[in-house]
Amino acid sequence: DSQPRDAVQKIGKGLAIGSVILLVAAVGAVALNSYFEEQEKGQSQSGEEYDEYQFAKRQLSETGEAYDEVLTGGYYEVGVHIPEGIYTVEAQDGESAIYLIDDENGIYIWQQIGNDPENPNQAAVMDDLRLYDGALLEVKSGAALQFRSDCAQTERLHGETNPLQDSVRVEVGQTMTAGRDFPEGLYNVKSEPDWNDLMMTLPDSFLSEFAADEERRVEVISFAPKELDLSYENVPIPKGTEIQTTGAAVTLEPSEKIGSTDYGEFYKE
């Protein structure tokens, strides 16, 4: 099985989640945006058009099944949570963004999607989004995004049913530790309707080599009091992670499908 990868930390590798996890830090978004702006600027000055897929090891099939699904904020492993294929992506209402991390094929994409005419970096519709099996797709909180494909490889979907069955509630002011107070694993994080941050303090084994000795890595998922912004899907919570919530109670609901359970790959630099 392919390993999930952390979109935020990939920013530091020349891509730009500078993570869910992020979960993905705001500075990551800025760094990633700046990276791609520089790439596009360099290409335009040389008269060339930047090709995000120039290092892909194979071509995606142009035949397959029709796929039409709405995805909200969260992490989606291609081949597990969404089939491989060539997609058109459109915001239903409002604006959002996607991060695509595909180390196998050298594909790193960050794109804002919405209908703000004053935002030159925002696409109303994103065509030709190529999702290869094993890549990690992150959909940011905001508008729900419609993913459509005429060549989705639905018959190749894999992964296993999540063995976890019980939900976990975390109250404001409470600290809970994965592996002690609840099982580590892959969860959908649901917040009560309020402005809220879920703070995830990762164990020492996930420290950056550049971090000071006393620092521990904290990932943040932010929620807004809007229906579409109250859930983040498929969040890996490794053993030893401390969970706190700042503005409202959250519920950790086991994700339906899981891929790899080696979350070191997800949070790696």
Q: Language-model segments: which ranges?
A:
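Short linear sequence motifs
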Residues: 28-29, 43-46, 69, 80-81, ...
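Gram-positive cell-envelope targeting signals
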Residues: 1-60
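Surface-exposed interaction/gating patches
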Residues: 176-198
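A glycine-anchored, Pro-Gly-centered beta-turn/N-cap motif
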Residues: 72-74, 78-86, 174, 181-186
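Histidine (H) residue identity feature
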Residues: 3-4, 81, 158
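Primarily secretory-pathway and cell-envelope proteins
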Residues: 33-35, 42, 47-60, 64-67, ...
